């Protein structure tokens, strides 16, 4: 604690003494993201305002660093009025600082959320008065069309360069005060512009706020004939083809545009869910039917465009060309007030036309003329000039009120062609001046030691002040040695900032690990292994959500059952992790599992297991699906077996048994994690609590748990879920090795068909396939719940007192960081590990079972507790490299393994021996208990037989007496 406190105080001292980055002075923190903080900066000489995005390199893995450098390279080549410009980039040994345009009205998500209060803001008062917001509706359609025109202009510019943004969402659409406000407000502060026309809209209204597309961390060059396969972006606005892990093209941005448009006109996203898997289910089940709220006032043209954009099949989705030529984008905005109706340019008399035109040609050139002149001047000028020339920027129409503004012409809504946009980019000649500068390494005391919280993805630019900007010349190109940005003294948050924090959950983006994809891909491959002949009826399919391809087939579709979260939200109660699920009889366990396997197989993979191999029967919905008993000869029937099944007769049987053993251990760990999850999330997130809904803080507070309790439960649940994921991943690794070996053998074996015809081989393949499909389903489910718990943990840590060791301000660099299959950069309290929790739980269960055994109470329950404790202790001893070559699937997998090893604290041999001794002790108790149960069962059978004999004797005697009395 003392170390963390001293580190925090050292960080505060650093921020007081060093507040300069190159030629800019850092004023205050105005935003925070997952890996970066955004500061308000000003030029030392001119005082022009900028936004400084400071990224701590130590918090980035290899993939995120590539995204950051990709963003820098892309922004260097882009210059457009509706794209946030990069002024400069300064790098040190620990941080990268991006000097960018400052957008003081915040982002579009805040604008939509505060739409009812726009009338109270002096910079949006006139807009709200002219185009009011209807009750319970979104923005006025005039404003929506205005923003769409500007967004389309930016996207057309990107498509001309074969760029795909991949993260279009309201949080990445930043706003500036309207050009009229900027031109007429004499008290406005200077804002450094990226180019001479940076504050001149290319489309839309001059009286409405100006929109700029920001955050190119996921952008990349993607020609129209190419496909990408990386899952990235924000889940709420992510295209379904990305959610399905399919390859996708630039049309993914069109889906995001559709979601943004829908949110602007209705005030809410089109699809809301607790996680991206549930989100995909809702998108798929909608059937491309987009409904609008009754309160929304939306024209038919706008509805048609939104529906064309929100087609789940990218082939059916509207094209970029059709979007750019759509009447909503190209035609004048209907419903404008008189002041905003474009006026034709004033015709000059012949007398004044000639001298004025010469003056305009020399002083105020048109956009294309000034562009060519500017480029010609720059080609002949030395490279010591800054990124943009002050003179063209001062000659902007915004600085000259009497200059004709291009957007006021009748064709202002037409987007300039490619050559008019790409050709005037000053990034080409300024590339050398925007190269990343590496000043001398600073002392360690100059670096902030307080890393930003993982999920606190706040507004990216500025909500701090609401003053109209004025363009200012760029600063001198010389850079002073960079020092770290530091947060100023804590200031009370403004209303806008608090509102922005309410939607912090929507700002998170998803980076799905390759292990997730590998698990699903392997399960898909194994599921296609030849099965027994199926009837035509059982071959009807619905494509699985994560399977590649477009799920357009609806023939014989089987509706998906409610997700587990939905079942809980609808009132299904959870059971204890070691209650009824572990105590079900073999017949009951098999019945529910059989039905689940049949339904899941038909829905996901296109075949059913043969009905005669699976038993039937109803069963109540358990808290979680128990690890199933698969239809194979001599397989155990309970959830957890004692493992005494004899030695497998062949290699395939041994592999199947090994896979099931690891899966069974993971199921026990999962059940323990569910106990924590049940306390943490009594009801699963619903439409009102999750993506696009109420803040996570609200649901936690309503549960009546303190912040410390939530942190403790979240940490324990998270490490247990990660342990379960590790065991499941190991099972899939074993299956992967078996699958590779089997394919290799069959490819060289000429008698493969004969082997496959064997009933035993077929049943064994069915057994392994069933296990793999169960593991895939459980893996995906655990991954979802781990993400929910991670978000709960991060939010709860922020609500702790600032002097609490788990508060984000006190996270030292050497804090326990969980870097696993599902989480990155989560800080845990000291002493938290899944192995310790599992060991304590196993001891507790064993002691309770021993007490009940001595008292002869609930002996079957004691047997279940002993078996569960043994499986949990075996999971404690289970290491990632036991009985298996070290996994080397990808770089990400290596990092996962490292994180998992750090989490388990690498048990030494002495600790392992202690755990093994406990396992032996519990096994002995289990053996004694089973002998007692067999004796009780034998005695019970003997008693039943004796009672049966007595009953038969009584019947015989009764019959003799009756027969004697009849003749009399």
UniProtKB/Swiss-Prot annotation:
Extent of Polar residues compositional bias: 441-452, 528-538, 545-557
Binding site for ATP: 30-38, 53
Record domain Protein kinase: where: 24-329
GO biological process: autophagosome assembly; mitophagy; piecemeal microautophagy of the nucleus; protein transport; regulation of autophagy; response to starvation; reticulophagy
Coiled-coil intervals, chain numbering: none
Annotated localization: Cytoplasm; Preautophagosomal structure membrane
The UniProt record lists the keyword Nucleotide-binding: yes
EC number(s) from the headed UniProt entry: 2.7.11.1
InterPro entries in the record: Atg1-like, ATG1-like_MIT2, Atg1-like_tMIT, Kinase-like_dom_sf, Prot_kinase_dom, Protein_kinase_ATP_BS, Ser/Thr_kinase_AS
UniProt keywords, alphabetically: ATP-binding, Autophagy, Cytoplasm, Kinase, Membrane, Nucleotide-binding, Protein transport, Serine/threonine-protein kinase, Transferase, Transport
Gene Ontology CC annotations of this record: autophagosome; cytoplasm; cytosol; phagophore assembly site; phagophore assembly site membrane
Family to which this protein belongs: Belongs to the protein kinase superfamily. Ser/Thr protein kinase family. APG1/unc-51/ULK1 subfamily.
Name of the molecule in the record: Serine/threonine-protein kinase apg-1
GN (gene name): apg-1
